[in-house]
Amino acid sequence: MLPLLGLCFALPLCAGLLEEARSWEDTSDQVGLRIPRQVRLLQRLKTKPLMTEFSVKSTIISRYAFTTVACRMLNRGSEDQEVTFQMQIPAAAFITNFTALIGDKVYQGEITEREKRNGDKVKEKRNKTIEDNGEKGTETFRASAVLPSKDKAAFLLSYEELLQRRLGKYEHVVSVRPQQLVGRLTVEVTVLERPGIAELEVLGLQNSRQRGSGRGPDDSGPPPSTVINQNETFAKVVFKPSVVQQAKIAQNGILGDFIVRYDVNREQSIGDIQVLDGYFVHYFAPKDLPPLPKNVVFVLDSSASMVGTKLRQTKDALFTILHDLRPQDHFNIVGFSNRIKVWKDHLVSVTPNSIRDGKVYIHHMSPSGGTDINGALQRGIQLLNDYVAHNDIEDRSVSLVVFLTDGKPTVGETHTFKILNNTREATRGRVCIFTVGIGADVDFKLLEKLSLENCGLTRRVHEDHDARAQLIGFYDEIRTPLLSDIRVDYPPSLVERATRTLFPNYFNGSEIVIAGKLVDRAMDRLHVEVTASNSKKFVVLKKDVPVEPRKVGIDVSQSPRPRGRGQEEPNHLERLWSYLTLKELLSAWLQSIEEPERERLRQEAQALAVNHHFLIPFTSMTLKSAPRTEAPEAAYGMSSTSMATGPETVMQSLRGTHLQPGPAVKKPYNPRIKISKTSADGDPHFVVDFPLSNLTVCFNIDGEPGHILRLVSDHADSGVTVNGELIGAPAPPNGHKKQRTYFRTITILVNKPERSYLEITPSRVIVDGGDRLVLPCNQSAVVGRRGLEVSVSANASVTISIQGTVAFVVLLHLYKKPAPYQRNHLGFYIANGQGLSSNCHGLLGQFLNQEARLIGLSKSPAHPPVPEAGERSEAVLEVKGRQVPVVWKQRRIYNGEEQVDCWFARNNAAGLIDGEYKGYLAAHPFDSETAFGPGLSQGL
């Protein structure tokens, strides 16, 4: 019997679109009735299920966020209990996967087409258990299961979203509400932005449903235990509070929203265009332009339901908003209940007197009567149309209605279809309507359609202490229009399936995003043309953008389903394109009137969502039991010895239903591969073997903690890149160094025959090739897929074999009781480099196919003279036409098991390596675009 009691999905679409969520099993008829007193007694004696771990990991690449939530629970009681996993997700996000591990059974979510009920249309109502806070809010995902006594469960949820730029910032919000104190709680947010991260801030935990106006910096600072590591293009934020720190924030486990805000560097031209594997995205966000004049009518609900806090906070917000109007703007105010009351019979210019009089009018508004939404909108739009028609306006301007209500139409025209039709005919595409719904009783679906059909936005504002700030924040998003009538054109012969390219307005601090597919992946340039209207002129921007499909940073594959033969590995730009396309199809379906058109849009969205594994109102998710396995936790990246071993051993991302436990993890064995001398180990000490010259050379690299060194770079030919990240440690007493550095992470990017990522630390190995698998280093295991094999020898080494022609060995240096100057670290050895090309580069890779010789040395260079006490043996090494002074040394490798005689090059291998040491620094762990010395470059 499937033990899941119920599963509620919060689908990321406008209010009114979600079909009632389904439960996989109804067990209500199986629960025996008890005497009420007996129930209360049993509840008192029950031991609540313990959450042993709550982990959220997000990776944001080019504003597109992949998030995976992992939760582990333990039933400590003596009887079966129901456990519930609950997570708030952004309303704009799409769920891509859900997996439950109950005991030794695995249940995996599968996205399929949702059948139309009664053969007509999707029900336009929401499950009452789903919290819907509108476009800027959250929806809650819930899953329940019966967990046997003393057994363990794990839930894993994945979702994706495109971050929207508002008020000049991108905001990524993670809900941290495990409902109890958790022994292992981790939130990890990684940001990768090719243009560079302009600024990044972590706000204090917030429990308000919406977050104020955004005016001025948040001075609360990041929550305790937050660690931020950042360079120009990469940032990693980790929040890992202890139980004591959690209790100081909230003893009930409802910590709040963990918020990361950032922006990116921008070029003042056509915008930022990124290309990857036949897909492109175009970000356009100009600034430093003169603002367009606004013609704005504020239409405010003053019906009886607005009495009290709602009307008071609305008035306070409008007082601030009126002060922000510019001298070139014009405005008017309409109050409505069952009667329509207009402040002036025409729009007035912004002056100190008009602002004062407008505030007085708002102050005297009092709640009474019903709600005539249709009449109020018609009057507001008429005021704008009359102003534009009867005034000779020299400058271009934008006409806006800001409409605010807390209820449903109760007076005048109350039929939704007629209100929408009347509004559409009145605006005629020349007036944009921005709607705000206050409180829980508002007809949010109507407001959303009004905005969608009339080039506006909609927000839901909650009736709480910060409603005033929410209103001001919404107005701030539209207070500064910079461009109108924006059109973006690409050559039709080069681009297909582009998303929306026409935009009525562009507001300061926002961003226009377009994604599409390229007809020819081999093209080297893309012509882009942007036309728009500014306050006094018509703007035309043209540019031929170089298309460099391999220079976009890393590609985090999110393949949600088994790929057939010939299918390429999906990439984040393909996911972004499908996400935007789905959003536009769903919006078009919402606005469509004709049933044939609605059915066409439904089928197109449904096919795209199933193909890319997105949960939308036209698809459904069913849980299917995966094949039984001896160690299902290990197959999903979890420790089989303990369900509370930490987030490091949890599978970080579910990429689809094709990950099945069993075949991926084989019986462990101890690999026996002969390791060459060519290596980077210790502090870090580099050893290079020149087999063609029967010579060994060594050198040191004095890096800084956090530096990422390029070790092997053959991305263009064999498709292999290896980077190593350094960690710092104090030097031993009486040493000549102030600090030492070691490798704490080795990352390997394999691009052929298909893309795979490996991340190796002393505690875990992450293998990500569409299926993401996490292997603990304290357990032996072997995994393999399509030419890539990874073997873990417990607490000793990790061996990576690629296509049978390339092999690397990573040694694990672990300390049971480390001294202050000791750190667990890694050593990297090239076991087999036959499959690497002659163009291979990097600190180690550049020497694999080179010859070297010693000049003026009579004895065999392979066996340097053993110097007598106090004597130094020196020589000159010739490599690549360069002569480098070297001195004879001895090095220990393979955990000190073997001693190597080598010729040592000083000064960070100056003259030995191409260029300088700094040319080998990577921007992020999976970066494959780094210059190596003067004029040398290897790119993605």
UniProtKB/Swiss-Prot annotation:
Domain VWFA: 295-478
Function according to Swiss-Prot or TrEMBL: May act as a tumor suppressor.
Record keywords, A-Z: Glycoprotein, Protease inhibitor, Secreted, Serine protease inhibitor, Signal
UniProt feature coiled coil, ranges: none
Highest taxon of source: Eukaryota
Protein's UniProt name: Inter-alpha-trypsin inhibitor heavy chain H5
PANTHER family: INTER-ALPHA-TRYPSIN INHIBITOR HEAVY CHAIN FAMILY MEMBER (PTHR10338), INTER-ALPHA-TRYPSIN INHIBITOR HEAVY CHAIN H5 (PTHR10338:SF62)
Annotated stretches, region: Disordered: 207-227
Matches recorded under Pfam families: ITI_HC_C, VIT, VWA
Domain VIT: 35-161
Gene Ontology CC terms, in alphabetical order: extracellular region
An annotated Gene Ontology molecular function: serine-type endopeptidase inhibitor activity
InterPro entries the UniProt entry points to: ITI_HC_C, ITIH, VIT, VWF_A, vWFA_dom_sf
Keyword Secreted: yes
Cleavable signal peptide: 1-16
Protein location: Secreted
Glycosylation sites: 97, 127, 231, 421, 508, 694, 778, 795
Family: Belongs to the ITIH family.
GO term, biological process aspect, one: hyaluronan metabolic process
